[in-house]
Amino acid sequence: MAIAHASPGEAVDVGPLGSRLPGEKIVALFKSEHLEVIRLVLTAGKSLPPHKVPGEITVQCIEGRIDVTAEGRSHVIGPGQLLYLSGGVTHGVVALEDASALVTIALVK
């Protein structure tokens, strides 16, 4: 069954998952014509392989620590930190601890 995306004007809880984190999955919170917001959830040691998207990206760490590698550089971010990546940049993510983050992607047509 598909998870319903948030509707315009609907508030979505994006706070830390805490002890629930290991049981959660990566989920798209909403997707519009120009923007997609994803809750990234990774347990310690798990990763997303290198990939790229055409649009610009922000990664805002909510809890834990993640290592985002982009253009051969490592960027370790923790709670309250945000990383901006240009569109078309190859990047990968490794969870250094159990972590969740909000990933915002500008959708380019």
Could you say what each language-model-derived stretch is?
Residues M1-H34, T69:
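A short, N-terminal "cap"/entry segment at the start of jelly-roll beta-barrel domains
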Residues G23, E36-V53:
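Conserved short histidine dyad/triad with adjacent acidic residue
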Residues V41, K52-D67:
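Short, conserved beta-strand element in jelly-roll/cupin
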Residues A44, P54, R73, V89, ...:
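A generic "binding-loop/recognition-motif" signal
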Residues S47-P49, L83, G87-G92:
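Histidine-centered metal-chelating micro-motifs
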Residues I62-E63, G78-P79, E97:
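A cytosolic small-molecule/anion-sensing beta-strand core signal
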Residues G72-G87:
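Short acidic-glycine-tyrosine-enriched beta hairpin
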Residues G87-K109:
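Ligand-binding loop in jelly-roll beta-barrel domains
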